Amino acid sequence: MLASKDSLVEALKVALNPENNPKRNFTQSVELIVTFKGIDMKKGELKLREIVPLPKEPSKPRKVLVIPAFQQIESAKKAEPNVLLTKEELQKLQGQKRAIKKLARQNDWFLVAQDSMALVGRILGPALGPRGKFPTPLPNAADITEYILRFKRSTLVKTKDQPHVQVFIGTEDMKPEDLAENALAVLNTIENKAKVEANLRAIYVKTTMGKIVKVELKK
Protein backbone atom coordinates (compact mmCIF):
# COMPACT_ATOMS: atom_id res chain seq x y z
CA MET A 1 0.00 0.00 0.00
CA LEU A 2 1.37 3.41 -1.00
CA ALA A 3 -0.19 5.36 1.90
CA SER A 4 -2.29 4.55 4.95
CA LYS A 5 -5.84 5.74 5.45
CA ASP A 6 -4.77 7.60 8.62
CA SER A 7 -2.10 9.59 6.78
CA LEU A 8 -4.56 10.45 4.02
CA VAL A 9 -7.19 11.58 6.54
CA GLU A 10 -4.67 13.84 8.30
CA ALA A 11 -3.52 15.43 5.03
CA LEU A 12 -7.11 15.93 3.89
CA LYS A 13 -8.02 17.64 7.16
CA VAL A 14 -5.17 20.09 6.58
CA ALA A 15 -6.15 20.63 2.94
CA LEU A 16 -9.79 21.30 3.91
CA ASN A 17 -8.88 23.65 6.75
CA PRO A 18 -10.07 27.22 5.96
CA GLU A 19 -6.48 28.47 6.29
CA ASN A 20 -5.48 26.37 3.29
CA ASN A 21 -8.87 26.31 1.60
CA PRO A 22 -10.61 29.72 1.69
CA LYS A 23 -14.38 29.68 1.11
CA ARG A 24 -15.36 29.96 -2.55
CA ASN A 25 -18.74 30.57 -4.16
CA PHE A 26 -18.83 27.02 -5.55
CA THR A 27 -18.23 23.52 -4.21
CA GLN A 28 -14.62 22.68 -4.95
CA SER A 29 -13.37 19.32 -6.12
CA VAL A 30 -10.76 17.46 -4.09
CA GLU A 31 -7.85 15.99 -6.03
CA LEU A 32 -5.22 13.36 -5.35
CA ILE A 33 -1.83 13.91 -6.99
CA VAL A 34 0.71 11.09 -7.25
CA THR A 35 4.23 11.80 -8.57
CA PHE A 36 6.83 9.27 -9.67
CA LYS A 37 10.62 9.15 -10.07
CA GLY A 38 13.00 7.14 -12.24
CA ILE A 39 10.42 6.69 -15.00
CA ASP A 40 10.97 7.61 -18.65
CA MET A 41 7.57 8.62 -19.99
CA LYS A 42 8.94 8.89 -23.55
CA LYS A 43 9.75 5.18 -23.45
CA GLY A 44 6.25 4.38 -22.25
CA GLU A 45 7.46 3.05 -18.89
CA LEU A 46 4.26 4.21 -17.19
CA LYS A 47 0.93 4.12 -18.99
CA LEU A 48 -2.31 4.38 -17.06
CA ARG A 49 -5.87 4.86 -18.26
CA GLU A 50 -8.02 3.27 -15.59
CA ILE A 51 -11.65 3.92 -14.66
CA VAL A 52 -12.05 3.72 -10.87
CA PRO A 53 -15.51 3.65 -9.23
CA LEU A 54 -15.31 5.67 -6.00
CA PRO A 55 -16.63 3.79 -2.94
CA LYS A 56 -18.01 7.01 -1.42
CA GLU A 57 -20.24 8.87 -3.85
CA PRO A 58 -19.29 12.54 -4.35
CA SER A 59 -21.98 15.13 -3.66
CA LYS A 60 -21.17 16.49 -7.11
CA PRO A 61 -21.57 13.49 -9.46
CA ARG A 62 -19.44 13.18 -12.56
CA LYS A 63 -21.26 14.47 -15.64
CA VAL A 64 -22.19 11.69 -18.05
CA LEU A 65 -23.28 12.01 -21.68
CA VAL A 66 -25.11 8.91 -22.93
CA ILE A 67 -25.93 7.86 -26.48
CA PRO A 68 -27.90 4.64 -25.98
CA ALA A 69 -29.37 2.16 -28.42
CA PHE A 70 -33.12 2.56 -28.98
CA GLN A 71 -34.04 -0.25 -26.56
CA GLN A 72 -31.81 1.31 -23.86
CA ILE A 73 -33.31 4.80 -23.86
CA GLU A 74 -35.82 4.31 -21.03
CA SER A 75 -33.32 2.68 -18.66
CA ALA A 76 -30.79 5.40 -19.51
CA LYS A 77 -33.32 8.08 -18.51
CA LYS A 78 -33.70 6.47 -15.06
CA ALA A 79 -30.02 7.17 -14.33
CA GLU A 80 -30.55 10.89 -15.05
CA PRO A 81 -27.39 11.49 -17.09
CA ASN A 82 -26.27 15.05 -17.72
CA VAL A 83 -27.00 14.65 -21.44
CA LEU A 84 -28.91 11.96 -23.31
CA LEU A 85 -28.74 11.94 -27.10
CA THR A 86 -30.35 9.60 -29.59
CA LYS A 87 -28.34 8.45 -32.59
CA GLU A 88 -30.41 10.78 -34.75
CA GLU A 89 -29.69 13.76 -32.48
CA LEU A 90 -26.00 12.93 -32.62
CA GLN A 91 -26.09 12.93 -36.43
CA LYS A 92 -27.67 16.40 -36.39
CA LEU A 93 -24.62 17.71 -34.51
CA GLN A 94 -22.43 17.09 -37.55
CA GLY A 95 -20.61 20.34 -38.35
CA GLN A 96 -21.86 22.22 -35.25
CA LYS A 97 -18.40 22.84 -33.82
CA ARG A 98 -19.47 25.18 -31.03
CA ALA A 99 -22.14 22.80 -29.70
CA ILE A 100 -19.77 19.84 -29.96
CA LYS A 101 -17.01 21.63 -28.05
CA LYS A 102 -19.51 22.60 -25.35
CA LEU A 103 -20.57 18.96 -24.90
CA ALA A 104 -16.94 17.86 -24.77
CA ARG A 105 -16.09 20.52 -22.20
CA GLN A 106 -19.10 20.05 -19.93
CA ASN A 107 -19.11 16.25 -19.60
CA ASP A 108 -16.69 13.85 -17.95
CA TRP A 109 -17.83 10.53 -19.42
CA PHE A 110 -19.22 9.62 -22.83
CA LEU A 111 -21.10 6.30 -22.82
CA VAL A 112 -22.07 5.15 -26.28
CA ALA A 113 -24.03 2.26 -27.79
CA GLN A 114 -21.67 0.10 -29.81
CA ASP A 115 -23.44 0.78 -33.10
CA SER A 116 -22.85 4.53 -32.59
CA MET A 117 -19.15 4.36 -31.67
CA ALA A 118 -17.87 5.06 -35.19
CA LEU A 119 -20.27 8.00 -35.54
CA VAL A 120 -19.13 9.43 -32.19
CA GLY A 121 -15.51 9.09 -33.27
CA ARG A 122 -16.24 11.08 -36.40
CA ILE A 123 -18.44 13.79 -34.83
CA LEU A 124 -17.25 14.17 -31.22
CA GLY A 125 -13.76 12.70 -31.54
CA PRO A 126 -12.00 15.89 -32.71
CA ALA A 127 -13.29 17.72 -29.61
CA LEU A 128 -12.73 14.87 -27.13
CA GLY A 129 -9.16 13.95 -28.07
CA PRO A 130 -7.45 17.27 -27.20
CA ARG A 131 -9.22 17.21 -23.81
CA GLY A 132 -7.96 13.72 -22.98
CA LYS A 133 -11.50 12.35 -23.11
CA PHE A 134 -12.82 9.32 -24.96
CA PRO A 135 -16.04 7.37 -25.64
CA THR A 136 -16.72 4.22 -23.62
CA PRO A 137 -18.94 1.52 -25.14
CA LEU A 138 -22.19 0.67 -23.41
CA PRO A 139 -22.98 -3.00 -22.76
CA ASN A 140 -25.55 -4.62 -25.05
CA ALA A 141 -27.99 -5.22 -22.17
CA ALA A 142 -31.34 -3.45 -22.32
CA ASP A 143 -31.03 -2.20 -18.72
CA ILE A 144 -28.05 0.16 -18.40
CA THR A 145 -29.24 2.21 -15.42
CA GLU A 146 -26.70 0.84 -12.93
CA TYR A 147 -23.90 1.02 -15.50
CA ILE A 148 -24.50 4.76 -15.96
CA LEU A 149 -24.83 5.35 -12.21
CA ARG A 150 -21.43 3.71 -11.69
CA PHE A 151 -19.83 6.21 -14.05
CA LYS A 152 -21.49 9.11 -12.20
CA ARG A 153 -19.28 8.17 -9.24
CA SER A 154 -16.19 7.08 -11.17
CA THR A 155 -12.91 8.87 -11.69
CA LEU A 156 -10.19 8.53 -14.32
CA VAL A 157 -6.58 7.69 -13.50
CA LYS A 158 -4.61 8.73 -16.58
CA THR A 159 -0.98 9.51 -17.30
CA LYS A 160 -0.02 12.02 -19.96
CA ASP A 161 3.53 13.11 -20.82
CA GLN A 162 4.72 13.80 -17.26
CA PRO A 163 5.42 11.24 -14.48
CA HIS A 164 2.38 12.05 -12.36
CA VAL A 165 -1.38 11.62 -12.18
CA GLN A 166 -3.94 14.12 -10.88
CA VAL A 167 -7.25 12.51 -9.99
CA PHE A 168 -10.67 13.70 -8.77
CA ILE A 169 -11.58 11.91 -5.51
CA GLY A 170 -14.59 13.90 -4.32
CA THR A 171 -15.77 17.29 -3.13
CA GLU A 172 -14.83 19.57 -0.25
CA ASP A 173 -18.14 19.01 1.58
CA MET A 174 -17.35 15.31 2.09
CA LYS A 175 -15.87 13.86 5.28
CA PRO A 176 -12.07 13.44 5.24
CA GLU A 177 -12.58 9.76 6.07
CA ASP A 178 -14.78 9.27 2.99
CA LEU A 179 -12.35 11.16 0.77
CA ALA A 180 -9.56 8.97 2.14
CA GLU A 181 -11.46 5.83 1.14
CA ASN A 182 -11.80 7.18 -2.38
CA ALA A 183 -8.10 8.06 -2.44
CA LEU A 184 -7.23 4.52 -1.35
CA ALA A 185 -9.30 3.08 -4.20
CA VAL A 186 -7.27 5.17 -6.63
CA LEU A 187 -3.93 4.30 -5.00
CA ASN A 188 -4.77 0.59 -4.98
CA THR A 189 -5.54 0.76 -8.70
CA ILE A 190 -2.24 2.50 -9.42
CA GLU A 191 -0.32 -0.01 -7.31
CA ASN A 192 -2.03 -3.04 -8.89
CA LYS A 193 -1.81 -1.85 -12.48
CA ALA A 194 1.59 -0.17 -12.55
CA LYS A 195 3.67 -1.85 -9.79
CA VAL A 196 5.35 1.49 -9.07
CA GLU A 197 5.91 1.44 -5.30
CA ALA A 198 9.70 1.68 -5.77
CA ASN A 199 9.21 4.63 -8.14
CA LEU A 200 6.84 6.61 -5.93
CA ARG A 201 8.08 10.13 -5.25
CA ALA A 202 5.23 11.78 -3.36
CA ILE A 203 1.48 11.92 -2.79
CA TYR A 204 -0.46 15.16 -2.35
CA VAL A 205 -4.06 16.27 -1.85
CA LYS A 206 -5.66 19.62 -2.65
CA THR A 207 -8.94 21.34 -3.41
CA THR A 208 -9.50 23.07 -6.75
CA MET A 209 -8.27 26.46 -5.51
CA GLY A 210 -6.61 25.43 -2.25
CA LYS A 211 -3.03 24.83 -1.19
CA ILE A 212 -1.34 21.54 -1.94
CA VAL A 213 -0.71 19.28 1.09
CA LYS A 214 1.78 16.41 1.18
CA VAL A 215 0.67 12.98 2.43
CA GLU A 216 3.01 11.04 4.69
CA LEU A 217 4.07 7.91 2.83
CA LYS A 218 3.79 4.46 4.33
CA LYS A 219 7.19 3.22 5.54
From Swiss-Prot:
SUPFAM superfamilies, per the entry: Ribosomal protein L1 (SSF56808)
Quaternary structure and interacting proteins, as annotated: Part of the 50S ribosomal subunit.
Gene3D superfamilies cross-referenced by the UniProt entry: 3.30.190.20, 3.40.50.790
Coiled-coil region(s): none
Superkingdom, taxonomy of origin: Archaea
Organism, as annotated: Sulfurisphaera tokodaii (strain DSM 16993 / JCM 10545 / NBRC 100140 / 7) (Sulfolobus tokodaii)
Protein name: Large ribosomal subunit protein uL1
PROSITE patterns in the record: RIBOSOMAL_L1
Family note: Belongs to the universal ribosomal protein uL1 family.
UniProt cross-references to Pfam families, sorted A to Z: Ribosomal_L1
Transmembrane segments: none
InterPro entries linked to this entry: Ribosomal_uL1, Ribosomal_uL1-like, Ribosomal_uL1/biogenesis, Ribosomal_uL1_3-a/b-sand, Ribosomal_uL1_arc, Ribosomal_uL1_CS
